[in-house]
């Protein structure tokens, strides 16, 4: 089964049936932020899904290869970084992983985080 995994984006050339991955040449499955490193809201998550759909459509007609999946995953990772920098999502300080892989957050006060772009 072809797949691409980045820190916050897992893409599988597969369908999910009964909690199992079934390899597919025609379906991609997306798992966003599997470690719950971010605090998500529905609008931000829908933006990621829409961007994923747009990227997949841009590759229509091209071979389904690991390289192309990695390109889509990298583009989505950058898209998520943009959401973080714009303040549409925030780091989850209760996450089991406090990696701050997309830049250090700035703490403004008790329980409030401000993301610092490029840090």
Curated annotation (Swiss-Prot):
It is an enzyme of class 7 (translocase). Pfam families: NdhM. GO terms for molecular function: oxidoreductase activity, acting on NAD(P)H, quinone or similar compound as acceptor; quinone binding. NDH-1 shuttles electrons from an unknown electron donor, via FMN and iron-sulfur (Fe-S) centers, to quinones in the respiratory and/or the photosynthetic chain. The immediate electron acceptor for the enzyme in this species is believed to be plastoquinone. Couples the redox reaction to proton translocation, and thus conserves the redox energy in a proton gradient. Cyanobacterial NDH-1 also plays a role in inorganic carbon-concentration. Keywords: Cell inner membrane, Cell membrane, Membrane, NAD, NADP, Plastoquinone, Quinone, Translocase, Transport. It is a peripheral membrane protein. This is NAD(P)H-quinone oxidoreductase subunit M. One of its GO terms (cellular component) is plasma membrane. The keyword ATP-binding does not apply. It is found in: Cell inner membrane. The gene is ndhM. It catalyses: a plastoquinone + NADH + (n+1) H(+)(in) = a plastoquinol + NAD(+) + n H(+)(out); a plastoquinone + NADPH + (n+1) H(+)(in) = a plastoquinol + NADP(+) + n H(+)(out). Transmembrane segments: none annotated. NDH-1 can be composed of about 15 different subunits; different subcomplexes with different compositions have been identified which probably have different functions. InterPro entries: NdhM. Belongs to the complex I NdhM subunit family. The keyword Nucleotide-binding does not apply. PANTHER family: NAD(P)H-QUINONE OXIDOREDUCTASE SUBUNIT M, CHLOROPLASTIC.
